[in-house]
Swiss-Prot record:
Belongs to the Nudix hydrolase family. RppH subfamily. It comes from Rickettsia typhi (strain ATCC VR-144 / Wilmington). A motif (Nudix box) lies at residues 46-67. This is RNA pyrophosphohydrolase. Its cofactor is a divalent metal cation. Accelerates the degradation of transcripts by removing pyrophosphate from the 5'-end of triphosphorylated RNA, leading to a more labile monophosphorylated state that can stimulate subsequent ribonuclease cleavage. HAMAP family: Nudix_RppH (MF_00298). PANTHER family: M7GPPPN-MRNA HYDROLASE. It is an enzyme of class 3 (hydrolase). One of its GO terms (cellular component) is cytoplasm.
Amino acid sequence: MKNSSNKYLDLPYRPGVGMMILNADNQIFVGKRIDTKISAWQMPQGGIVPGETPSIAAMREMLEEIGSNKGYIIAESKCWYSYDVPSFLIPKLWNGNFRGQKQRWFLIRFTGNNKDINIHTSNPEFDQWRWTSLDELLSIIIPFKRKLYQAVVKEFESLIQ
């Protein structure tokens, strides 16, 4: 979704990673964001620390957001995907320095158990979590990320077996 306010179009995208985390039943991890009153479900994502590779960032973010990094990378996206946040959110996120995010996405096989997942981390981003199907994923995602998620699903779909 493109930004409706031109004053933000010159801002860069924040470099980050996203993770499509699969359990043994090929269900996808989603968390409900803690910082909004609306039902905003998403897959884990986060920023890349300077000097960090995207794959290292993905595993670090997995640990930070779901309390476990038990898993392995199946695939990395072939390109960077980007999204713009709604203009009213820009001043509230990342000190207003970015218009959205550009992300490398990773398909990750979770090798732990549900009891290994702990979203009550030192800086929690989610207040609920669940496993969802590929079919349901796009219908529960916050709308401004839907186009990006469609592209990620299209790229990884054939690898989810």
